[in-house]
């Protein structure tokens, strides 16, 4: 069950990045919607938080890579 949830979370992460939408409000909504049918009463909040953390980290990495890729050295 947790493996399926993780796979779905990764698919959601890819979909959000495809849109380049890293707004925390959107991330929260997407994770909550993705896991709305969670059956683990004690673990659902944790799963949603892990989803959000993963998506935020990927957004930060994407922003860092974009910034690094746009840096040029020498005359332009």
UniProtKB/Swiss-Prot annotation:
Signal peptide: 1-18
UniProt-annotated glycosylation sites, renumbered to this chain: 26
Protein transport is among the record's keywords: no
Chief site of localization: secreted
GO cellular component terms attached to this protein's record: extracellular region
Keyword Ligase: no
Subcellular location: Secreted
GO biological-process terms attached to the record: sexual reproduction
Entry keyword set: Disulfide bond, Glycoprotein, Pheromone, Secreted, Signal
Superkingdom, natural source: Eukaryota
Disulfide bonds: 22-59, 31-51, 38-44
SUPFAM superfamilies linked: Mollusk pheromone
Quaternary structure (record): Binds to temptin and enticin.
A Pfam family this chain is assigned to: Attractin
Tissue: Produced by the albumen gland of the egg cordons.
UniProt GO molecular function: mating pheromone activity
Organism of origin: Aplysia californica
Taxonomy of the source species: Eukaryota, Metazoa, Spiralia, Lophotrochozoa, Mollusca
Chain's role: Water-borne pheromone that attract the marine mollusk Aplysia into breeding aggregations and coordinate male and female reproductive behavior within the aggregation.
Matching InterPro entries: Attractin, Attractin_sf
Name of protein: Attractin
């Amino acid at each position: 069950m947790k493996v399926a949830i993780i796979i779905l979370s990764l698919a959601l992460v890819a979909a959000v990045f495809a849109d380049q939408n890293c707004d925390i409000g959107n991330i929260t909504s997407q994770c909550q919607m993705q896991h709305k049918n969670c059956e683990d009463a004690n673990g659902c909040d944790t799963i949603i938080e892990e989803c959000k953390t993963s998506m935020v980290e990927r957004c930060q990495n994407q922003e860092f890579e974009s910034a690094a890729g746009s840096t040029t050295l020498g005359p332009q």
